[in-house]
Amino acid sequence: MPILVIVRHGQSEWNLKNLFTGWSDVELTPTGEHEAEYAGIVLRPYHFDIAFTSVLKRAIHTLSIILNQTGATIPIIENEALNERNYGDLQGLNKAEVGEKYGAQQLIAWRRSYTEVPPGGESLENTCQRVIPYYQEKIEPELKDGRNVLIVAHGNSLRALMMHLEKISPEDIAHVDLATGAPRLYEFSSKLDLNSVSYIKLPETPLDVSTLL
């Protein structure tokens, strides 16, 4: 039976600084690289046939580290449909400072609402409108053919996909988050009915990755 694993990229430089990132193309921090290494370690027991990611380097780098850890050599498809939600004019701004300027309620609406559009950017609804068709047209056929798929992308593009796969409502998605570097496993039937959803647990204690290479 086919499986799908989704992974949010490791911590980025702007995650660390609490900045709105969106389509800004920033790199991973050393912590983010370690998160990707841990994800790769726990994914070693799983076989993947193909991987999908965005065109942003924090996701591409995370995927590269994961595949290096698993030892897999598989096709990789990069597409901007899997990019992070575009935060428009908020990109590069500190979230706390935005809250001070516009108020906490507006900050929460821009970050968590399904329909709220930041100036010059996308709502989560807009993000769904590109992520879900791409999944249906390009990724779902791979699963239907029995292939195991790995997707490494971003918090909001993956939340959009979670809404579709797990039938999460626009109201409930506001309370759903996805930690950096935490693999989420979807197991399907041969007819692509969803059988189970679970996180593949990362190590409870820090690992010396060098001993596992």
From Swiss-Prot:
Keywords: Gluconeogenesis, Glycolysis, Isomerase. Pfam families: His_Phos_1 (PF00300). One of its GO terms (molecular function) is phosphoglycerate mutase activity. Belongs to the phosphoglycerate mutase family. BPG-dependent PGAM subfamily. GO terms for biological process: gluconeogenesis; glycolytic process. It comes from Cytophaga hutchinsonii (strain ATCC 33406 / DSM 1761 / CIP 103989 / NBRC 15051 / NCIMB 9469 / D465). This is 2,3-bisphosphoglycerate-dependent phosphoglycerate mutase. The record marks 154 as: Transition state stabilizer. Catalyzes the interconversion of 2-phosphoglycerate and 3-phosphoglycerate. Its EC number is 5.4.2.11. Substrate binds at residues 8-15, 21-22, 58, 84-87, 95, 111-112, 155-156. Pathway: Carbohydrate degradation; glycolysis; pyruvate from D-glyceraldehyde 3-phosphate: step 3/5. It catalyses: (2R)-2-phosphoglycerate = (2R)-3-phosphoglycerate.
